[in-house]
């Protein structure tokens, strides 16, 4: 599914372009846009590109909101309905192949719930709608990001998943365990 194309079509067909417009593109389109003067810039993406956006906005003192990712935890307590929480966390993490800014990146839970959580999570990922063979399976945005993700994996800590294909830009839903804040993935 070409989500950005669908969004651009819907917005550009229904809003006055003087008010709101979606422009799809790469580096050249982004550079052309950054040369323009705007009332406000809202950017979601990498730190590296965020710095470029901010520097360009400074030329006109344009207000900027940067959403540059980060790490979003999910916290589970002893009182939680674990099966329900696992279902919701897996959905939230793997929608759009985890490429959403609020996707949970790690789980904080009592040690006593760890194994049950892992078992339930692996079973949830095994559902057909998460299958890599599914025609609607979402691709990672580009090969560079597939390589970036692959470099973050510590094979010794992969509980399930971890497979990827650079050519098709598909990365299996992956769960790692015993991860510390010193690991590359964090």
Question: Where are the predicted features?
Answer:
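A structured beta-alpha segment of the ubiquitous adenosine-cofactor-binding alpha/beta core
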Residues: 4, 21-39
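Conserved small-residue-rich beta-alpha loop and adjacent elements
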Residues: 1-18, 61
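ALDH superfamily catalytic-core signature
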Residues: 40, 48-184
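Phosphate/pyrophosphate-binding betaalpha-module
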Residues: 14-21, 36, 44, 48-51
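Conserved residues at the C-terminal ends of beta-strands
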Residues: 23-26, 44, 92
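Short alpha-helical
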Residues: 1-2, 27-29, 48-49, 59
């Amino acid at each position: 599914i070409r989500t950005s194309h669908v969004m651009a079509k819907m917005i550009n067909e229904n809003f006055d372009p003087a008010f709101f417009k979606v422009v799809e593109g790469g580096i050249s389109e982004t550079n052309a846009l950054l040369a323009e003067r705007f009332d406000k810039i809202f950017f979601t993406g990498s730190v590296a590109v965020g710095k470029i956006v901010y520097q360009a906005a400074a030329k006109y003192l344009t207000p900027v909101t940067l959403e540059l990712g980060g790490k979003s935890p999910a916290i589970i307590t002893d009182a939680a309905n674990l099966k329900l929480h696992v279902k919701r966390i897996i959905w939230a993490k793997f929608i759009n192949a985890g490429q959403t800014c609020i996707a949970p990146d790690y789980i904080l839970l009592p040690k006593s719930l760890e194994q049950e959580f892992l078992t339930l999570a692996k079973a949830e990922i095994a559902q057909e709608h998460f299958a890599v063979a599914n025609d609607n399976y979402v691709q990672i945005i580009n090969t560079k990001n597939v390589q970036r993700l692959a470099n973050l994996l510590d094979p010794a800590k992969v509980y399930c998943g971890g497979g990827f294909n650079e050519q098709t830009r598909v990365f299996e839903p992956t769960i790692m365990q015993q991860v510390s804040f010193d690991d590359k993935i964090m």
